[in-house]
């Protein structure tokens, strides 16, 4: 419970002049050595009707002087108990400390308010259970460098604590203390600063890390070069452009940066360096972009730097496209408004040669490729499986399929490819009924293309049809064979004609 006097003092905002000095003193509103005190709002006081002080500063001064009554008054006026403790520590007023400290209970709450390192240390000592480690940790939080300067020698040899305090200072971005620890104590894992700098995206902390590193090693040191390379890889991977530039000040290869920038589509980094590097490097980056499945914008940036000229490395490019099954660059070159570069067929040939049926079908759908082109390529490359699957999918009707396969044979020059297509036709006809016209047409087709074995097979099959018509067909085939010097076809046709003549009644 407040006394009546306390209630009056707490809520008195009136001018003190009419009250007289005696009444002011009786009310406890006189501060020895300073004069009368009057409350001004909630945060200030007026001293001797002239000076304005904040209530916290006033209670600190009163406590340092040990004026318990005035301290009590200022606390009534919403002065801070924490500042009262600080003032008592400054004046070594231990009676006041003992009286008020228990109301706070934890000295650590007061530490951030203290600027004087000596008072800071005294305050920390109020908690008798605290250790030096605790003092150092709070000194980091409150940027109290003099504590380290005073007791730093006690940390020598304690590697664990030094590392802990160093990393804590890095996390709290206390640069002054980081520098002091880094230059004056042995930190066994100095590189921890870089990991924290990356997480917090703190370039100042990052630069400070290099300053500390270079205090221990030179830029030509193998370990330093390895560290720089790792940093460049990570910074470019995360798109931290300023960090990349900072690392490059101390060494490292731009190529390291560019390959990561391509892989993770960081075009700002790429655009900064792309016009400063040789064409050979750009070509390697484009191949890497295919492997990394880079974005459309990344590809356009790379291609524009070489004016979309891919001829010098087109074989390598096609190999990469097929190997990694990523066709975006083929589309981009085809989509150019002027001077389109068509690599569809070239890539298709590689795909047909090395890829699976599903991959080829996907490519056909993507670029609207005619199945005939694929089948003919498959025939030249002896991909029997592809001929069958793609022709089956493209032309479900067997007669339609035979018709298209025959057209392909007619337009092919590759001998082995033609033979493969004709054997495929023959396999279809093995389980397909052909009428007389279809059978005769196919027989003549085999004769025209010098498919001896298939011609013989068809001749045997045709004996079930009209013999007179068959004889006429065979005479045509014999004429074709003689004209082109197809000896075996001619012999077979001649034998069949003689046999028909033999079995036909006269």
Swiss-Prot record:
Domain of life from the UniProt record: Viruses
One Pfam family linked to the record: DUF249
Protein name from the UniProt record: Protein MGF 505-9R
Function: Plays a role in virus cell tropism, and may be required for efficient virus replication in macrophages.
Record-linked InterPro entries: Ankyrin_rpt-contain_sf, MGF_505
Family: Belongs to the asfivirus MGF 505 family.
Keywords, ordered alphabetically: Early protein
Induction: Expressed in the early phase of the viral replicative cycle.
